[in-house]
């Protein structure tokens, strides 16, 4: 039975993610901060919620910045929400924070004056929104284009390499909702809260061989 490591650095909705993975039959799901267990896992999930400064402080304290770079190179890897944002070069949040740098680009604030067709939009962007599939990818299998997923975020990803953007969202402006590079895939939305389509994405991740 394959092992899925859900990385625990104290800043994630870990049990919901683990429960959803178990629900789709992903295998043996372990919530862990043990580097040895993470290195030996067949698949890696990197969730996250909260302020990016706190997240990055814990990630660096535990040595997960280099570990994540290492283990994501040769097996399926999934970043979720702030776990995705931590993979970028930097974030504007908390006055500016350097991140892991797995994906080139910056995490930016939606702003307090966000509008769509004359209507003021509340920040954070919270609730269901469509994701346009920019390219075909194994993790989109059996998920229709423009499917709705659940988002909660005040900061969005401005990707520097548009070829890595495999899903796009829109909330007053366009943003990267999903990024991919080799065996690495990351999403801004919460698949574990996104009902049928979110569970399908997790099921696809559990079956994915990491090639793209």
From Swiss-Prot:
Catalytic activity, EC: 4.3.2.10, 3.5.1.2
Pfam families listed in its UniProt record: GATase (PF00117)
GO CC terms, sorted: cytoplasm
InterPro entries from the UniProt entry: Class_I_gatase-like, GATASE, Imidazole-glycPsynth_HisH
Alphabetized UniProt keyword annotations: Amino-acid biosynthesis, Cytoplasm, Glutamine amidotransferase, Histidine biosynthesis, Hydrolase, Lyase
Gene Ontology molecular function terms on file: glutaminase activity; imidazoleglycerol-phosphate synthase activity; lyase activity
Domain Glutamine amidotransferase type-1: 3-212
Active site: 81 (nucleophile), 190, 192
GO biological process: L-histidine biosynthetic process
Subcellular location: Cytoplasm
UniProt-listed SUPFAM superfamilies: Class I glutamine amidotransferase-like
Known catalytic reactions: 5-[(5-phospho-1-deoxy-D-ribulos-1-ylimino)methylamino]-1-(5-phospho-beta-D-ribosyl)imidazole-4-carboxamide + L-glutamine = D-erythro-1-(imidazol-4-yl)glycerol 3-phosphate + 5-amino-1-(5-phospho-beta-D-ribosyl)imidazole-4-carboxamide + L-glutamate + H(+); L-glutamine + H2O = L-glutamate + NH4(+)
Subunit structure: Heterodimer of HisH and HisF.
Function recorded in the entry: IGPS catalyzes the conversion of PRFAR and glutamine to IGP, AICAR and glutamate. The HisH subunit catalyzes the hydrolysis of glutamine to glutamate and ammonia as part of the synthesis of IGP and AICAR. The resulting ammonia molecule is channeled to the active site of HisF.
Name of the protein in question: Imidazole glycerol phosphate synthase subunit HisH
Species for this entry: Pseudomonas syringae pv. syringae (strain B728a)
Annotated gene: hisH
